């Protein structure tokens, strides 16, 4: 039994033909041109690093959940109860002339005061680290602003935080370059081009030194446990040095927080770049055949230390990156390879002598 015919369907618009892509004209390369041909490199790092920046900003500004507020309220109530009970014990000991109990209350008050002071100090340092993110946002707004009146005060505050004296030659050149007719964008831009590179150069030197030490230590040390302890210690020292250069005093919790943010940023944006830099060396210069396995591991550890220093520099820096002033792993890669080759050649030539 045949199926009945389906009713006709009328369309409101005619069917649109799919556009066909036009092919480009054929190009024929000569033998000489084929040797010098190089494919265009596609760099996807800005998009990846934008995602990483969003993740870091989200971690730097955590949301205040209800449970966290309840815990903080409970701790505050408990602290007030402890203080009230201590005051009551002190009054009772004074009235009953119980000098032993009064001495115990005084000792407890000193301990509590020291604990509260350390907590306040740690909170202030952690708050200072969070304020650096707000300063970067403010600097980014000023770099796109055409208003007048905020740029100079903002830059003077940054110079004071970094410990740059008013009589410093770089700051004097900045003062000589600015005038009243310039807007905030131009003033902050001059500060970023004249004053900020001085601190960035010091941070680059620290990163190069610590990365070279990590590379050489891994290359010559036969103990993996010693290598791990040394790398962890030097990486923490590097973070402290960079934070000090940019005028941030790190406490215990702020140091842990910065280290966690740096590792988070590396996990998001650094893995692909690290693999690309190491792979570039292995493929182009055949390092696997020229260097030993320990030397290759040393280069990897040095690049990881350099990457950590770059991200710590980015999080501690009060200004956003402008144009191409951000340091790249390639800047440190060639230096690490040269230093490692020179060290290995010296170690091979010394026994022959």
Curated annotation (Swiss-Prot):
Basic and acidic residues composition bias: residue spans: 1-19
Keyword GTP-binding: no
Cellular component, GO annotation: plasma membrane
Membrane topology: Multi-pass membrane protein
Keyword Ribonucleoprotein: no
Main localization (coarse): membrane
Keywords from the UniProt entry: Cell inner membrane, Cell membrane, Membrane, Transmembrane, Transmembrane helix
InterPro entries per record: DUF697, UPF0283
Cystine connections: none
Subcellular localization(s) per the UniProt record: Cell inner membrane
Annotated segments matching region Disordered: 1-35
Spans traversing the lipid bilayer: 70-90, 100-120, 213-233
Family the UniProt entry places it in: Belongs to the UPF0283 family.
HAMAP family found in the cross-reference section: UPF0283 (MF_01085)
Protein name: UPF0283 membrane protein YcjF
Organism: Salmonella paratyphi A (strain AKU_12601)
């Amino acid at each position: 039994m045949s199926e009945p015919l389906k009713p006709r369907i009328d369309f409101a618009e005619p069917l649109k033909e799919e556009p066909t892509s036009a092919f480009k004209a054929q190009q024929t390369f000569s033998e000489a041109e084929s040797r010098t041909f190089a494919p265009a490199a596609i760099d996807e790092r800005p998009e990846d690093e934008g995602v990483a920046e969003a993740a870091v900003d989200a971690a730097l500004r955590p949301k205040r959940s209800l449970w966290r507020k309840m815990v903080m309220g409970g701790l505050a109530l408990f602290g007030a109860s402890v203080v009230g009970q201590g005051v009551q014990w002190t009054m009772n000991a004074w009235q009953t002339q119980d000098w032993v109990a009064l001495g115990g209350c005084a000792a407890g008050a000193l301990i509590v005061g020291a604990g509260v002071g350390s907590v306040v100090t740690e909170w202030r340092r952690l708050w200072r680290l969070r304020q650096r993110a707000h300063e970067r946002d403010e600097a980014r707004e000023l770099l796109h602003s055409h208003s007048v009146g905020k740029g100079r005060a903002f830059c003077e505050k940054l110079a004071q935080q970094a410990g740059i004296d008013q009589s410093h030659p770089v700051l004097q050149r900045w003062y000589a370059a600015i005038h009243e007719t310039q807007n905030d964008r131009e003033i902050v831009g001059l500060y970023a081009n004249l004053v900020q590179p001085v601190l960035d150069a010091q941070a680059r030197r620290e990163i190069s030194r610590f990365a070279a030490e990590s590379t050489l230590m891994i290359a010559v040390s036969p103990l993996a446990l010693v290598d791990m302890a040394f790398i962890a210690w030097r990486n923490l020292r590097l973070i402290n040095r960079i934070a000090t250069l940019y005028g941030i005093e790190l406490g215990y919790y702020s140091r842990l927080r910065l280290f966690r943010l740096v590792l988070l940023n590396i996990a998001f944006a650094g893995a692909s770049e690290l693999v690309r830099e190491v792979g570039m060396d292995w493929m182009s210069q055949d390092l696997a055949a020229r260097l030993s396995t320990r030397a290759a591991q040393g280069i990897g550890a040095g690049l990881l230390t350099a990457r950590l220093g770059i991200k710590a520099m980015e999080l501690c820096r009060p200004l956003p990156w402008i144009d191409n002033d951000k340091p790249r792993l390639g800047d440190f890669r060639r230096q690490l390879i040269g230093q490692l080759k020179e060290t290995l050649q010296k170690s091979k030539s010394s026994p022959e002598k």
